[in-house]
Structure formats: C-alpha cells, structure tokens
Amino acid sequence: MFNWNIVAQLLSLALVTLSGPAVIFLLYFKRGNL
C-alpha cells in the first residue's frame, strides 16, 4: 500500500525548498523597486 506519510513529508520538504528562495527573491525585488 502507498505510504502517504512519506509523500506528505516529501511534499512539505519540496515546498519549503522552493518557497525559501522565492520569498527572498520577492523581498529583494520589492526593496529594489522602492
């Protein structure tokens, strides 16, 4: 049977990995605009 716990952990890890640089880029972009 499929283990959803591992899938949830991988998805959350991927979200954190992708959202980290995205937030930094957005903050830098907004500061650069001002």
From Swiss-Prot:
It holds the Pfam family PSII_Ycf12. The chain crosses the membrane at residues 6-26. Keywords: Chloroplast, Membrane, Photosynthesis, Photosystem II, Plastid, Thylakoid, Transmembrane, Transmembrane helix. InterPro entries: PSII_Ycf12_core-subunit (IPR010284). It is found in: Plastid, Chloroplast thylakoid membrane. The keyword Transport does not apply. One of its GO terms (cellular component) is photosystem II. It comes from the Eukaryota. It is a single-pass membrane protein. One of its GO terms (biological process) is photosynthesis. PSII is composed of 1 copy each of membrane proteins PsbA, PsbB, PsbC, PsbD, PsbE, PsbF, PsbH, PsbI, PsbJ, PsbK, PsbL, PsbM, PsbT, PsbX, PsbY, PsbZ, Psb30/Ycf12, peripheral proteins of the oxygen-evolving complex and a large number of cofactors. It forms dimeric complexes. Belongs to the Psb30/Ycf12 family. A core subunit of photosystem II (PSII), probably helps stabilize the reaction center. This is Photosystem II reaction center protein Psb30. The gene is psb30.
